Each structure stands twice: as structure tokens, then as C-alpha cells.
Amino acid sequence: MFVSKAAVVGGGTMGGEIAQAIAAADIPVVVKDIDQKFVDAAVEKARAVTEGQLARLVKKEKLTSEQADTRLAEVMGLVTGTTTYEEFGDVDFVIEAVPERMEIKQAVFR
């Protein structure tokens, strides 16, 4: 199965890290949460994880700083956030990463 766009429902720490892993595989990903502050936190988490990974590669001299900066821009260019489902029309794959509370999970799957 080929995935051309993915989505993560839930913008917590786990959602941000999942989004980062998807974007690092060069797949566009949209992160959805009910509150913009959680969307922003997920995007920031994805950025922080990517920066950490790239910094380790620079330290090991596997990448130059310029290459790391370019790759950071590429990866983060694939991560977008939203508070609605409107951007899900062309999504091939959705990962649910909301808190482990039944009422929240039920609301997501309705």
C-alpha cells in the first residue's frame, strides 16, 4: 500500500512524534486536535525531534550544518496542523493518538 498523505488525530507528545516519523519518511502529514494550542505543540514536538536527530548526525559528521538545515526545512514543510477534519479529504492513512479516555475516543470515531 502506498501512502501519499497521512493524518494524526491527537496533538499530544505522541501525536507530534508520530507526525515527525511520517514526515521524516517524506510523507506529508496533517496533525488534528480540538485546540490550536495542542496542534502547535505537536508541530513543535515534531520540530524538536527532527532538530535532535539532525544535530546528532552533524555531530557524527554524517551531515553538514547546511544539509541539516535543509533537511529540517524539508521535513517540517511536510507537517501541517488543523483543528478540523477538512484537510482529511485526500488522506490515505490515519493514526489515532488521542488520550486514553473512552469518551474522547468515541467522539473521534463518530
Q: What do the predicted segments below correspond to?
A:
Residues 1-52:
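NAD(P)+-binding Rossmann beta1-loop-alpha1 motif at the extreme N-terminus of oxidoreductases
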